[in-house]
């Protein structure tokens, strides 16, 4: 079995390739060619902490694996990662364990890739400005993916802890060579954005202003019913709300459950799963005036396909450590 660390994965990753593999996984899922149960969510130690268990099989892509990840928001106060995890990949024919991959970095790039796919199909082609609300680790992968699919010229940042936003602004300037500005108010930060990303653990909406026409949102932070990043009017007034899995999104996120409860949105109002747009079964953006929302809660099959991509690259390049059971 091959063990692949976060640093080793970092050297293997090409974001455009990861975006392509994520799109393939989404398409297989929406065509009902995978077995991807709704993940098991286990609270532990306190009500904020969550352990997530996510298996998946993708027959057509010959992939079998399991992801286990923990989310501990308070870890940031003691200088530790808030997301920790592992992904186990098994041989599709024999069931033997093939690889064990560090899971927090993989989660970051897969989360980014999902937003990259959504941005490619749902943001305006001429989108130039990106607003990121929440500047933790997950935001790095999303920024990289959005930059990969759109010609971003300016980035606006908002974070509850301003120092982290300034550090992220420096990261943007160094990695992408584009100006990044920190705002003290989230409503001001979104005011001139073509693309908005929310990646927080907020339980109440992170902005309140009405959205401008033509904007696209990637909302990735809320993965539990008691978490809500988007104001209900953002969901209710969107022309298209898109998800990875309708069943999972409706069961798992307050971003949809709250507006449904308030009578502002119905399950049938979800425009499409992202895989249906990739395949051409449903339309993506159809005009520059549309407001589009991608509400992401993650999808195990994408993790497993990205893990397989990393495993195959690692084998090809002789990266990782072989261990015997």
Curated annotation (Swiss-Prot):
Which superkingdom does the taxonomy of this entry point to? Bacteria
The reaction(s) annotated as catalysed by this protein in its Swiss-Prot or TrEMBL entry are: L-proline + NAD(+) = 1-pyrroline-2-carboxylate + NADH + H(+); L-proline + NADP(+) = 1-pyrroline-2-carboxylate + NADPH + H(+)
GO MF assignments: oxidoreductase activity
**Which keywords belong to this entry?**
NAD, NADP, Oxidoreductase
**Cited NCBIfam families:** PRK08618.1 (NF006379)
Name the family.
Belongs to the ornithine cyclodeaminase/mu-crystallin family.
State the protein's name: Delta(1)-pyrroline-2-carboxylate reductase
Q: Which gene encodes it?
A: arcB
The organism is Bacillus cereus (strain ZK / E33L)
Give the UniProt entry's GO cellular component terms: cytoplasm
